[in-house]
């Protein structure tokens, strides 16, 4: 039996979650509903043509209040209050909360009132029953976890790397910088924004701003709580980001040991989540890459044995959207 999911919010993440399900060919998850306040025809057009990921490789049909992307009609609604969505009627197992609005447990729980069995939020969520980075701590999911956060794209990139390196050599303390592609909450020209850095034109400057992604690793890996912090620099590219992590190891290590630990994990327990490259790649090379994190082996540096610097790439849209599907399926198996 496939897990039935409904997508609330058909923006960058909502559309990519559906596309990732279709393109991967997976049959263990079925999208039965989409809720978005935009016209059905507009949502279909934006799904069909994507400036970042290219044209959808299949046919997209609209008939009444449905969209068909190759697996039969998907019901489309335009309801403002998630508590009023037809989850019960449609037998929704997992509501994928992708609006970026209902990001606290209390707000996201409206989907439960509508009849969904569980909710997965596509962002950090205050008060969530559990914050999950698939491949790192998804096995902690239990029947008690009704509202779950899928963390952020940056935490999904950092956590697998941090887990492997903490297990291998120990992390005393560390600081991460994410060099991050601009996103939809940044303007094309200067305008009002509560964050004055993000008030500036996205494609014209490198923009320092904040991120809670490093601290959030402590929610996923309690052994690293309080040991990591970070910052963000938004750059004038539309997709693909990279983390630059510097940490103090608990014991002396080497570039070779660090890289070997990553290669071993990426080839075994974290295969499909953590990847690696030894090529002189640049950001565009990782566009549409489904990994949560792709470690750049030749960028590893070790100073005086214990000061370590590593670099890992991530498609901040596509990788995260693939993990939304993975986590939703894991939640669906809870019953």
From Swiss-Prot:
Q: Per the record, GO CC terms?
A: cytoplasm
Localisation = Cytoplasm
Q: Tell me the leader sequence span.
A: none
Alphabetically list the UniProt keywords.
Answer: Cytoplasm, Glycolysis, NAD, Nucleotide-binding, Oxidoreductase
Q: What is its main location?
A: cytoplasm
Q: Which residues form a coiled coil?
A: none
**Which class of enzymes does this protein belong to?**
oxidoreductase
- List, in alphabetical order, the Gene Ontology terms for molecular function in this entry: glyceraldehyde-3-phosphate dehydrogenase (NAD+) (phosphorylating) activity; NAD binding; NADP binding
Q: Give the residues the record marks as binding NAD(+).
A: 12-13, 36, 80, 122, 316
A Pfam family of the record is: Gp_dh_N
One GO BP annotation of this record? glucose metabolic process
Q: Which residues form the active site?
A: 153 (nucleophile)
Q: What does this protein do?
A: Catalyzes the oxidative phosphorylation of glyceraldehyde 3-phosphate (G3P) to 1,3-bisphosphoglycerate (BPG) using the cofactor NAD. The first reaction step involves the formation of a hemiacetal intermediate between G3P and a cysteine residue, and this hemiacetal intermediate is then oxidized to a thioester, with concomitant reduction of NAD to NADH. The reduced NADH is then exchanged with the second NAD, and the thioester is attacked by a nucleophilic inorganic phosphate to produce BPG.
Quaternary structure?
Homotetramer.
Q: Family membership, please give it.
A: Belongs to the glyceraldehyde-3-phosphate dehydrogenase family.
Q: What is this protein called?
A: Glyceraldehyde-3-phosphate dehydrogenase
Query: What is the scientific name of the source organism?
Result: Xanthobacter flavus
């Amino acid at each position: 039996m496939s897990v039935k999911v409904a997508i609330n919010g058909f923006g960058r993440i909502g559309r990519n979650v559906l596309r990732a399900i279709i393109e991967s060919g997976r049959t263990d998850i079925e999208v039965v509903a989409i809720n978005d306040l935009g016209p059905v025809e507009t949502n279909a057009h934006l799904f069909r043509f994507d400036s970042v990921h290219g044209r959808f490789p299949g046919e997209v049909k609209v008939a009444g209040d449905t969209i068909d992307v190759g697996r039969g009609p998907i019901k489309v609604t335009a309801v403002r209050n998630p508590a009023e969505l037809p989850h019960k009627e449609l037998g929704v197992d997992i509501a994928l909360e992708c609006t970026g609005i209902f990001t606290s447990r209390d707000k996201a729980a409206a989907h439960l009132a509508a009849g969904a069995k569980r909710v997965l939020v596509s962002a950090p969520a205050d008060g969530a029953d559990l914050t999950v980075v698939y491949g790192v701590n998804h096995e902690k999911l239990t029947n008690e976890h009704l509202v779950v956060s899928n963390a952020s794209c940056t935490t999904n990139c950092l956590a697998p790397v941090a887990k492997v390196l903490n297990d291998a050599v120990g992390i005393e303390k560390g600081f991460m910088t994410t060099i991050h592609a601009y996103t939809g909450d940044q303007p094309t020209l200067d305008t009002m924004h509560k964050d004055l850095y993000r008030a500036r034109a996205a494609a014209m400057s490198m923009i320092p701003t904040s991120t809670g992604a490093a601290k959030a690793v402590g929610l996923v890996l309690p052994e690293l709580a309080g040991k990591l912090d970070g910052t963000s620099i938004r750059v004038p590219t539309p997709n693909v980001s990279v983390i630059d992590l510097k940490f103090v190891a608990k014991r002396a290590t080497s570039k070779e040991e660090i890289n070997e630990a990553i290669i071993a994990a990426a080839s075994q327990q974290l295969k499909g989540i953590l990847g690696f490259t030894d090529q002189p790649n640049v950001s565009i090379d990782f566009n549409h890459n489904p990994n949560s994190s792709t470690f750049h082996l030749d960028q590893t540096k070790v100073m005086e044995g214990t000061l370590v610097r590593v670099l890992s790439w991530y498609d901040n849209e596509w990788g995260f959207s693939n993990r939304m599907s993975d986590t939703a399926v894991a939640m669906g198996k809870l019953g």
